[in-house]
Amino acid sequence: MKTAIIGKKVGMTQIFDEAGKVVPVTVIEAGPCTVTGKMTKEKEGYEAIQLGYEDVAEKKLTKPEKGHLDKAGVGYKKHLKEFRLEDCASVNVGDVIKADTFKEGDKVDITGISKGHGYAGVIKRFGQGRTPTSHGGGPVHRHAGSMGSSTDPSRIFPGKKQAGHMGVDQVTVQNLDVVKVDPELNMIVVRGAIPGPKGGIVYILSLIHI
């Protein structure tokens, strides 16, 4: 059965595998999450569950959020997220999902908001090369170069890579291996990097694409 959980990125470290090789890993504080809603094919036309993560004061919720959570009777939660799962029959509103919903060896997709880098140039934003730094290169070493051509077309085509805002995008990293699960500490350790800064909220879902 596919499952999901909401967590918080703690940071990165490294461990050694059985062969003695260094493996970079990310530590995630996963759950506990409370099921705050359940969607069924009969009523909504699809199957899904909504999870709530982290308690929050009542005054920090909107009226629709407060009404929804009061109806569910699960307390007030700061983060709500809906996950489409194939079989939700065994899950009910009020159930608590913890880190042990995953096990070592599972493959997961993790979604988060990437780090913000502010206004960035084409070199940092897209990895473009610089112009020659000698022999009359001029003061344009980090510029984007020619864009609009001459009289025809006399404009910049849509999609041209230019300087602009970088980061703060929703990013999903797929097919990550779960290296370790610690139910007592609500910790999940995955191989590799995941999007976002330390303390950023991430959504962990069983692998969708193989």
Q: What are the residue ranges of the model-derived segments?
A:
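Mixed-charge, glycine-accented linear interaction segment located at domain edges/termini
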Residues: 200-202
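Conserved small/polar residues in nucleotide/adenosyl-binding loops
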Residues: 208-210
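Basic, glycine/proline-rich low-complexity segments that contact nucleic acids
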Residues: 2, 9-18, 24-179, 188, ...
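Glycine-rich phosphate/pyrophosphate-binding beta-alpha loops
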Residues: 196
